[in-house]
Amino acid sequence: LFMYDLFGTLSKSSYLFHELINNQILNLEVMKILNSLASMNKGRNYLLAKETLIDDIVQCMIREKTDSDLRQKCLGTIQKFTLRSQPQNKLIELNVIHYIVNLFANEAETLSDYTIEYGLALIMNLSLRKAGREKFEAIADKTIQILQKFMDKDNIQVLTCINGTLYS
């Protein structure tokens, strides 16, 4: 995996990755690959070597105004990054908590199961950090309403994430 720097994460320049993720024709396919790589420990090691990668993926996710495949892959990728504390801190700093809570508050009825599962897993993982809990405290009412909204889902992953968030 490290033998070929396919996405330029090991180089000082961000040009290659930035161009790939911002290319309207390629960005979905690039995000599918990144999402797959983020599923593996070595893949996360490789991808997170590029400090600006999380910023670019978050911006790509925010640009998408619908629950598209691209936004889903961005969300899934950053959720997988939150298995580590440094990306958790970065995502909290980028205000992803407010973004995902507002997304759920405004679009809950139209979101795919994928977005709901990965979004709630992201909320749970970010709530494990003290800084994350402080951000959630500022929007506690809205967060609780969202968690309540999804409690009737017949999906064990969703219920596990809700439970984990409430207990953190």
Predicted regions and their residues:
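Amphipathic alpha-helical segments within extended alpha-helical solenoids and repeat-rich scaffolds
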Residues: 1-20, 54-64, 97-108, 144-155
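Elongated alpha-helical scaffolds that mediate protein-protein interactions in large eukaryotic proteins
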Residues: 1-27, 36-54, 84-95, 129-141
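Alpha-helical solenoid repeats of the armadillo/HEAT superfamily
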Residues: 21-35, 65-83, 93, 99, ...
